[in-house]
Amino acid sequence: MSITQERKQKLIKEYAITENDTGSSAVQCAILTERINNLTEHFKFNHKDHTSRRGLLILVGRRRRLLNYIKKNNVSEYLDLISKLGIRKIK
């Protein structure tokens, strides 16, 4: 369910703005998207796991708030990020 340290480092390198950037909004959204995708795969086989489903909803809400922040501050960065992550626009 969780992502490996190697996968997390790869995401950080891919979405980082500078070399030592590990906490920017884009990096956080990428890591949250990876965790959300892993949980979505988990629910295909464990559809009665309601505790993890609540965790999924919390992660989706956190990602939505981060994306709203990015959209408010830099629309072009927001559009680039959602296209790279493969997610839909926020209304």
Curated annotation (Swiss-Prot):
SMART domains: Ribosomal_S15 (SM01387). It comes from the Bacteria. SUPFAM superfamilies: S15/NS1 RNA-binding domain. One of its GO terms (biological process) is translation. One of its GO terms (cellular component) is cytosolic small ribosomal subunit. Keywords: Ribonucleoprotein, Ribosomal protein, RNA-binding, rRNA-binding. InterPro entries: Ribosomal_uS15, Ribosomal_uS15_bac-type, uS15_NS1_RNA-bd_sf. The keyword rRNA-binding applies. GO terms for molecular function: rRNA binding; structural constituent of ribosome. One of the primary rRNA binding proteins, it binds directly to 16S rRNA where it helps nucleate assembly of the platform of the 30S subunit by binding and bridging several RNA helices of the 16S rRNA. Forms an intersubunit bridge (bridge B4) with the 23S rRNA of the 50S subunit in the ribosome. Belongs to the universal ribosomal protein uS15 family. This is Small ribosomal subunit protein uS15. It comes from Rickettsia felis (strain ATCC VR-1525 / URRWXCal2).
